[in-house]
Regions:
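Short aromatic-glycine-(Arg/Gly/Cys) micro-motifs in beta-strand/loop hairpins
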Residues: 1-16, 43
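Intrinsically disordered, low-complexity peptide-like regions
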Residues: 4, 10-11, 32, 53-55
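Surface-exposed loop/edge segments in extracytoplasmic proteins
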Residues: 14-19, 48-50
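A short, charged, amphipathic alpha-helix used as a generic interaction element across diverse proteins
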Residues: 21-43
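Short, mixed-charge low-complexity intrinsically disordered segments
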Residues: 36-67
Length: 67
C-alpha cells in the first residue's frame, strides 16, 4: 500500500521530496528531523497540500493551506 502522505522541504519555493509518511504525526516528525525551514505535506488520498514551518526551537507550525 502506498503511504498516504508525502513530505517535501521547500527552498526558494522549490520542493525536494523527503519521503513518505503513514500519518500526519510521522510527517511532522520528518520535518522536525530536517530542522529549520519550510515544508509541504501532501495527501495522496485527497490531494490536499499544507505548508508547515519549523523554527529554531524545533516547533512545527502550519503556515497556510496550499490546496
Amino acid at each position: 500500500m502506498i503511504p498516504p502522505l508525502d513530505v517535501f522541504s521547500l527552498k526558494n519555493d522549490e520542493p525536494t521530496w523527503l519521503g513518505p509518511a503513514e500519518s500526519l504525526e510521522k510527517a511532522l516528525e520528518i520535518t522536525r528531523q530536517n530542522g529549520i525551514g519550510s515544508y509541504l505535506i501532501c495527501s495522496q488520498r485527497t490531494g490536499r497540500k499544507e505548508r508547515y514551518q519549523v523554527d529554531a526551537n524545533g516547533t512545527v507550525r502550519r503556515t497556510r493551506g496550499v490546496q
